[in-house]
Amino acid sequence: MEPWSRWKTKRWIWDLTISTLVLTFLFQAREVRGAAPVDILKALDFHNSPVGISKTTGFCTSRKNSKDPDIAYRVTEEAQISAPTKQLFPGGIFPQDFSILFTIKPKKGTQAFLLSLYNEHGIQQLGVEVGRSPVFLFEDHTGKPTPENYPLFSTVNIADGKWHRVAISVEKKTVTMIVDCKKKITKPLDRSERSIVDTNGIMVFGTRILETDVFQGDIQQFLITGDPKAAYDYCDHYSPDCDLTSKAAQAQEPHIDEYAPEDIIEYDYEYGETDYKEAESVTEMPTVTEETVAQTEANIVDDFQDYNYGTMETYQTESPRRVSGSNEPNPVEEGFTEEYLTGEDYDVQRNISEDILYGNKGIDGRDSDLLVDGDLGEYDFYEYKEYEERTTTSPNEEFGPGVPAETDFTETSINGHGAYGEKGQKGEPAVVEPGMLVEGPPGPAGPAGLMGPPGLQGPSGLPGDPGDRGPPGRPGLPGADGLPGPPGTMLMLPFRYGGDGSKGPTISAQEAQAQAILQQARIALRGPPGPMGLTGRPGPVGGPGSAGAKGESGDPGPQGPRGVQGPPGPTGKPGKRGRPGADGGRGMPGEPGSKGDRGFDGLPGLPGDKGHRGERGPQGPPGLPGDDGMRGEDGEIGPRGLPGEAGPRGLLGPRGTPGPPGQPGIGGIDGPQGPKGNMGPQGEPGPPGQQGNPGPQGLPGPQGPIGPPGEKGPQGKPGLAGLPGADGPPGHPGKEGQSGEKGALGPPGPQGPIGYPGPRGVKGADGVRGLKGSKGEKGEDGFPGFKGDMGLKGDRGEVGQVGPRGEDGPEGPKGRAGPTGDPGPSGQAGEKGKLGVPGLPGYPGRQGPKGSTGFPGFPGANGEKGARGIAGKPGPRGQRGPTGPRGSRGARGPTGKPGPKGTSGGDGPPGPPGERGPQGPQGPVGFPGPKGPPGPAGKDGLPGHPGQRGETGFQGKTGPPGPGGVVGPQGPTGETGPIGERGHPGTPGPPGEQGLPGAAGKEGAKGDPGPQGISGKDGPAGIRGFPGERGLPGAQGAPGLKGGEGPQGPQGPIGSPGERGSAGTAGPIGLPGRPGPQGPPGPAGEKGAPGEKGPQGPAGRDGVQGPVGLPGPAGPAGSPGEDGDKGEIGEPGQKGSKGDKGENGPPGPPGLQGPVGAPGIAGGDGEAGPRGQQGMFGQKGDEGARGFPGPPGPIGLQGLPGPPGEKGENGDVGPMGPPGPPGPRGPQGPNGADGPQGPPGSIGSVGGVGEKGEPGEAGNPGPPGEAGSGGPKGERGEKGEAGPPGAAGPPGIKGPPGDDGPKGNPGPVGFPGDPGPPGEPGPAGQDGVGGDKGEDGDPGQPGPPGPSGEAGPPGPPGKRGPPGASGSEGRQGEKGAKGEAGAEGPPGKTGPVGPQGPSGKPGPEGLRGIPGPVGEQGLPGAAGQDGPPGPLGPPGLPGLKGDPGSKGEKGHPGLIGLIGPPGEQGEKGDRGLPGTQGSPGAKGDGGIPGPAGPIGPPGPPGLPGPAGPKGNKGSSGPTGQKGDSGMPGPPGPPGPPGEVIQPLPILSPKKTRRHTESIQADAGDNILDYSDGMEEIFGSLNSLKQDIEHMKFPMGTQTNPARTCKDLQLSHPDFPDGEYWIDPNQGCSGDSFKVYCNFTAGGETCIYPDKKSEGVRLSSWPKEKPGSWYSEFKRGKLLSYLDVEGNSINMVQMTFLKLLTASARQNFTYNCHQSTAWYDVLSGSYDKALRFLGSNDEEMSYENNPHIKALYDGCASRKGYEKTVIEINTPKIDQVPIIDVMINDFGDQNQKFGFEVGPACFLG
């Protein structure tokens, strides 16, 4: 046998083997996934047009190679279609994984179920809801997933009035929706592993059972297939694009090709039916020859391109390997059969067979997604389930070499394809500016174009020789339906009927549902149509048509490009002098301007010394713009400016004159064909263009009936130009046509908009100055002008009204202290203020006279143990030397030796207080006195407050206390001012009342032990110190470091009284304490010398406007100030906002095209345009310029106490006020219970000076010191380290007073000085026996002042009671605040704290102190024992009488129940008539309890009288809890029968008497024993009845609120709309709130946004970005809501209100200027629609919320000022009220918006 014969025989056997294998695999693949899809429309008999179904045009109006459009069905709301599920799934098995495929066009804006599948129990198992937010409902036999887990595709909107191809794939636990073959969304589907869908029920089309919403719209195809991958191929296999032919033979012309292989499937697209027709078997398998295979190579590639099952990124997980066309075995088996086994249906095999038999199609090379590297062997088909398992094909020689997708076919031409050129770069978008587009006349005919490329592929060639026999085809799809059969049996559901013969069947809810199912299953007799057939194959491209006749002159074209700028025109004539422009509006605050004009003279201040010449300050803030001046003369024309940057694209200019004809362009090379774009929306017809050469076939238009070709008619007139349509997709480039003849000149176009201004003309000559015009409207803000000259001082204006509170201005410079005013009259005591922050410590005052013995203070905390000093006897008291001038700081001196011991002097009698002497100059420091002998060691005293040693400050005079003024409301705390200069000491005032104890200060650092102090007299018993034996007096040790704070020791016993020590030396000034609040003003200090100029401080925040003060007297006219330096010219301010658009001028003639000029100089301001229409209500404007101060207004009323302000900075120490009048002494209150230990307080404010103490023991006179002369002013040195204390020197002899030295710099504020010497000890009281707690007494008057102790936790404010006995020893308290200032001693170093002296004798009554701060709420005290009952109180105020209820019908008499507890006591009635038998029992006076038992809360009632209105319980106090009823008192003598009830003729029902009489008849006289109790019972019953009436029919008042307005309307249908109180949680009515009830709308409950959320005015918002939430704006915030009284609403109440609500609505009004709010007419979309944020933080928009509607959409057209009203009416209550809004359409030059937020209304 010849070699070629052997090879050919082997090859034939090989081909047969391959074919057999392929057919075997295909057959198995069909078994796996080849089940025919279920055609729902066919099963439901849509093609016979049941009720509510009609035929209409479908998805494609025309298809390639098809005359007729697709047929779809229009479904209206009358359609009621259903069928048994088994009719659709005859096998009774619904696939576990499946695809639902449908092509629909729902009615715009609808949302309804397209398919509902129920099981035999009436439970919906499957549903597809389509519309604005599609939902896939699935519930298997286990009830999974639950409804809240149904997949919701909220980002998809298929109810937009357009056709959509939707495929849903359900595989395992995911559901994927593919819309229009592009958008793919996958959601989890939480179903069971083996979920089952029952097919024993029915399927309902277009709705759900018992639901009113039905599907309305068009549907073309509706399939369910058991292949979950079919959804991915929906647009390839089931519903191809309109420009593709069906991949099977066209079903619209059914025939069987003579070459058709077996099992070619014909898909009919006529109306969504699938005709499964098997072609006749071809008996002979065609032989595949080499020629056929060679021809087939391109077809296989091309046809596989049509079955691209996803992009490479989706399915290809590794790059394909390049495989050469080697002779490897089984290429088809490896390359294709794997794909077929995966379940891909018939099309791939069909195309292989079809192309082998029909001839080939040229390879295209433009769409091959699967060809990556160029050879055919690089096809990688993967099974869908196994994306990672790659099977590589190895092509055999018989397939030939593949062609790479990248290859350009320029060298070869395969089957008539022309060479494709490379695609050119995309051109820049044209920018046509006004004046640039000048349309010329048509040019002359151009030269003939270049030879065009070869045409598109021609028709298929003749059939080739019969090929080898192909493999057996797959089994065909089921055949077409047969004739309708006889009516089938109805679906019978076995129902269990209950009841007997006389009663109808008992129907359960499920059976009723199933009956509804049966009613909807009545249209199950006719056979439904099948699915649509496949699209036909694309037809050949037609050849070029003949040249058309010359067209008529076209309409005016669009404006041409802007011409080159022409040369400047001739100089214009001088214009007339224009009128001055109108004043501009207030601009935005500019940059800091130059120095402003001098303001009006203020009130003259106190004459001060001339200060230093100030340095030049930094540039100040901008001044307010001045009024516009008269327009200046025109300046000379400036030099030509440099060229500016290209301006923005301008408006379309007027049509220019035609330009010369241009040269014909070179023909472009045909680019490759681009991918098919989506079909754009149908545009409106554009203007007719000139006839062009025929282009390639465009997108199919709507298919009309094909008429016979008519003869050419006469030339018609050009029609009117239509509106421009939307840009369609770009067509393929056509061939270059020949240039046509020049057309006739078209008519002039319409007047275009005004073009850009031309170049600036030459300056004209000055015109004649015109008359001054009237003042125009206020223009917009101009730039800030330069500072003008100072104007003349104007006349004093009249007194203006008090203006509203301005915004906080910057902090002004500190003013000088004014003169001290006369004390005003004492006002009434104000309310007690809140606890203020402790003030700064004051300067130490002089030692006052000895105070009276105070009450025992609270025990202080244990201080640190001081070093034990050597007790000396009291030395002689030296005379006080004159205060010397402050010297410079000396070096640390050595510790002096102790002085000689002095003798103790005797106590002198207390002398009378001396008159106030003049303030002497400060004397020099005395020498240390001689050391005294050691005295007896006293018991350990309380440790003192060791302070860190500061520098010694000047001793100030103590000013007299001022009179108590009216306690005003607590003002906001001001910011801390700088520390002022220290004033001269004032003279000591008379003693003031001791204030309340200050809060404890923080513990200071431990100070060094001071010098040895003089022993004092025995003090009161101190608290026991730390335990330890007392040692002998040791020598003074060196100062130790500060120890840590030790733990609090146990409470010690009272120590024995120590001797009284003399006053120690004044301690040094300590560190400044924490800043306290500003104290009351002190007296005016002497005028200090001006300090040096400080640096410029930062501008403080504006202070809050205080109340209007009293008008001060007019001061003398001040002398004119010096002229200030002229300020520098400030920088130009910011650009003002754009002015109103002027009127359009007439169009100018087109200028010659000149070169682009440089930007000219800015022209002068134009005149203001005419006044525009009334604009919409604007927001509040920016704050206007601050006006000049008017004269003082009238005295305002005293305001209410304001809220506490923020803590201000420390102000200057004010002058001390004059002494106030002494207040009356109140009785001493009882000791309070010990409060819990409070936190350490801050340092207390300076207390008033106490009365002068008794004279101390006389000390030995020291040697006189020499008088020091006034030293020079010392500079303030740095604070040095604390030196060790020196021993006290002997006092010097009083020297002559030195001269006053110059005033030094202000020193730091010192701590208060040490306390003065304690008074003599009083007798120690014994612990009294605790008495019974009495009733709360009336608050006592304030007691005499006690020593400052630690403030306990504030108790409730009470008046001071009478003095109680001294209490037992209290717990050890925390360390107290530093005491009041001690007497002025000679300056020395701080000594150790001496032992506590005994209590002094009670002093005279002190003056009343300034009211202290309000304490915080203390813990409630223990409950006292019940006191004896008081006398019967006066009757309480009558309660609010409820509205009388309607009179009820007479009820049946009830039995008398057990005697209940006594009810609320009514108001005492008039005395009743005495009974005939016996006198009534005596009225118990005074509520003395009867002997029979304990006293109940109410006393025994008085004699019954006729009922008055129900009173409140008690004597106008709050109602307490009801107590147990007391035992009844002894019964009075019996009254006549029935008389008990007579006093209650109104309150008691009529049946009561009869009922009582019947009981009396049965029970005899026993009932009379309870006459008093019965009246209380009936009163209680009546009260209960009224309460129940109020609960059933609430009145909507604050005390009787309703749950919602709907409840109120149901209770009182005649109530008008208005404001009512509601309490949704129905608890205590104290949390009720007031709402607006809209009964007209059905009882809506409405709440309102707060003032700042009501809306914003129309503005351009230049600094904000579109697409931002309003809360992110600089001036934005989240929207919040209040009740109608402006109070915030409790969150719990809002939650209850929403629980009681079925739907809620809220309106939102968007005010716009050229800005869209909802629908955009220009783009035809909702892309820029508003978005809202609901209260549940859920975003609401057009796409995801069908409950938002535009009631009026004026902003859609973007024309001028309009508004859009949007209503959110939703059953999702949590979305309302909205709390934020996103605005998307603003930012352009003319766009503005504002909005108004309406109330949120809830309807129950």
UniProtKB/Swiss-Prot annotation:
* BP-aspect Gene Ontology terms: cartilage condensation; cartilage development; chondrocyte development; collagen fibril organization; detection of mechanical stimulus involved in sensory perception of sound; embryonic skeletal system morphogenesis; endodermal cell differentiation; heart morphogenesis
- Region annotation (Nonhelical region) ranges: 229-417
Region spans: Short nonhelical segment: 507-509
Region listing for Nonhelical region (C-terminal), in residue ranges:
1541-1561
Q: Which intervals carry biased composition (Gly residues)?
A: 539-548, 581-590, 1040-1049, 1160-1169, 1481-1490
Q: Which UniProt keywords apply?
A: Calcium, Collagen, Disulfide bond, Extracellular matrix, Glycoprotein, Hydroxylation, Metal-binding, Repeat, Secreted, Signal
Q: How does it assemble?
A: Trimers composed of three different chains: alpha 1(XI), alpha 2(XI), and alpha 3(XI). Alpha 3(XI) is probably a post-translational modification of alpha 1(II).
Name this protein carries in UniProt:
Collagen alpha-1(XI) chain
Recorded source organism is: Rattus norvegicus
What broad taxonomic lineage does this protein's source fall under? Answer: Eukaryota, Metazoa, Chordata, Craniata, Vertebrata
Q: What is the name of the gene encoding this protein?
A: Col11a1
